[in-house]
Amino acid sequence: MDKEQAIKIARAYKQAILPLYGDAKVYLYGSYSKGTAHQDSDIDVAVVVPHIEGNWFSVVPPLWTKARSVSTLIEPVLMEAGEHSPLYDDVMRTGVIV
């Protein structure tokens, strides 16, 4: 799979989560955004929302369920916009918004 195919899958995932997180920005990050993907790479997708509402353990599982309905390669992560973490910084620096 190439970067463009990974972007198409990430876009399909974005459409799948719109009912849950209509205000989310979705980024492809990791090996596909950096051009270092290989045959066994997963598709790293960051779902960035203005504010995480509710219990983490109740809001994250639906993201995984939707991911599996699109592709078993998707590895979603939920983030709050502006959070202070190395992963968030990496997504903002190297991620591709879809």
Residue spans of the language-model regions?
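Short, well-ordered beta-strand segments
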Residues: 27, 44-46
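Glycine-rich beta-strand-to-loop/alpha-helix junction loops that act as flexible
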Residues: 29-31
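Catalytic core of pol beta-like nucleotidyltransferases
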Residues: 1-25, 34-39, 50-98
